[in-house]
């Protein structure tokens, strides 16, 4: 169950993608409304959880100014975003966390009461006819099961592991989709202009 005080809840911001549709730009450092996408993500989750970390590939020094731990995928690098979720679960467990909130860095409009609205883990956000598999609450106790899943032959689909642990979808009926992703320059321009 999500702890309303956030003391047993941790968050991992997922920023491991290559940003290919944006020409290889680091999405975490893209500017939207005068702030980086990572600033937006930190602001979204920080009031909901006891601690925040970032899952990102490459040199962690580029994120030093944000003051949060930067997690690496380790031996599961290249197996997709679940490697970042696993790194987040391991970090959360080491810091006394029982539940992990995951949020992609390219989802700047997620609600600041996301964890409370998701309720008990495992839960995933759904809106406007889509399931947003990485906007989710994960039980940290599922880390060993996720490790076995990633040690398997694949495919390493988030939906596959979510089904394995019985993740339930929680509908967000907001008029505007709170889980719009910024994947292209057109998406960024639309977000900047308030069209999404």
From Swiss-Prot:
Class in the EC hierarchy, top level: transferase
Gene Ontology CC annotation, any one: cytoplasm
Keyword Transferase: yes
Pfam families per UniProt: NTP_transf_3
EC number, as in UniProt: 2.7.7.77
GO molecular function terms listed in the Swiss-Prot or TrEMBL record: GTP binding; metal ion binding; molybdenum cofactor guanylyltransferase activity
Keyword field: Cytoplasm, GTP-binding, Magnesium, Metal-binding, Molybdenum cofactor biosynthesis, Nucleotide-binding, Transferase
Transmembrane segments: none
GO BP, one annotated term: bis(molybdopterin guanine dinucleotide)molybdenum biosynthetic process
Predominant cellular place of this UniProt entry's protein: cytoplasm
Binding site for GTP: 14-16, 27, 73, 106
Keyword GTP-binding: yes
Obligatory cofactor(s): Mg(2+)
Subcellular location: Cytoplasm
Reactions catalysed, as given in the entry: Mo-molybdopterin + GTP + H(+) = Mo-molybdopterin guanine dinucleotide + diphosphate
Function of the protein: Transfers a GMP moiety from GTP to Mo-molybdopterin (Mo-MPT) cofactor (Moco or molybdenum cofactor) to form Mo-molybdopterin guanine dinucleotide (Mo-MGD) cofactor.
Assembly information from the UniProt record: Monomer.
Family of the protein in this entry: Belongs to the MobA family.
Free-text note regarding domains: The N-terminal domain determines nucleotide recognition and specific binding, while the C-terminal domain determines the specific binding to the target protein.
Protein name per the record: Molybdenum cofactor guanylyltransferase
The species this protein was found in: Acidiphilium cryptum (strain JF-5)
Gene this chain is encoded by: mobA
């Amino acid at each position: 169950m999500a702890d309303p005080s956030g003391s047993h809840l941790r968050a991992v911001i997922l920023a491991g993608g290559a940003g290919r549709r944006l020409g290889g730009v680091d999405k975490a450092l893209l500017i939207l409304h005068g702030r980086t996408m990572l600033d937006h993500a930190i602001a979204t989750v920080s009031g909901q959880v006891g601690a925040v970390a970032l899952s990102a590939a490459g040199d962690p020094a580029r994120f030093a100014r944000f003051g949060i731990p930067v997690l690496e995928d380790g031996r599961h690098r290249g197996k997709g975003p679940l490697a970042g979720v696993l790194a987040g679960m391991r970090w959360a467990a080491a810091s006394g966390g029982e539940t992990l909130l995951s949020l992609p860095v390219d989802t700047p409009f997620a609600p600041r009461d996301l964890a409370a609205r998701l309720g008990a883990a495992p839960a995933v956000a759904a809106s406007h006819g889509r399931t947003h598999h990485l906007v989710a609450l994960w039980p940290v106790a599922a880390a060993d099961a996720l490790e076995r899943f990633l040690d398997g032959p694949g495919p390493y689909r988030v939906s596959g592991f979510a089904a394995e642990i019985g993740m339930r979808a929680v509908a967000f009926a907001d008029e505007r989709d709170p889980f719009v992703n910024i994947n292209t320059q057109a998406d960024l321009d639309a977000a900047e202009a308030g069209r999404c």
